Amino acid sequence: MNYRNKTLLEIVRESPCQLCGAQDGTVVAAHSNQQRDGKGTAIKAHDYRIAALCYSCHSQIDQGSKMLKEDRMELWEMAHRKTIGWLFESGRLELIPEKNLGEFKKS
């Protein structure tokens, strides 16, 4: 079963497009199209494998015929990394450490 988080998807809509910078009200959480990310027939990838993309960029990556598949995958990965960065840097996502975890052991 794939990870789902409606709140995360809603928060990403506040982001500018992580490819072109558009803030035109069309930005959504564009899921990965890769099987390795949980994508299947009629099944979206995990909600943590998303990129904030506007309608135009999302369309170009999902159905674009002007780019090779490898180029579309590379652009999506870049937008995904930027989206995760935006979530943390904007303060919309933060880690809350569990109590009593102790210090991480160094290898």
Describe every region a protein language model picked out.
Residues 2-30:
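Short cysteine-rich loop/turn motifs with clustered Cys
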Residues 38-48, 59-107:
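Polybasic, low-complexity binding patches
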Residues 21-22, 57-60:
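Detector for the c-type heme attachment site
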Residues 54:
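Zinc-coordinating Cys/His ligand positions in small cysteine/histidine-rich zinc-finger domains
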Residues 51:
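Active-site cofactor/substrate anionic-group-binding motifs, chiefly glycine-
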Residues 25-41:
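Short recognition patches in nucleic-acid-associated and regulatory proteins
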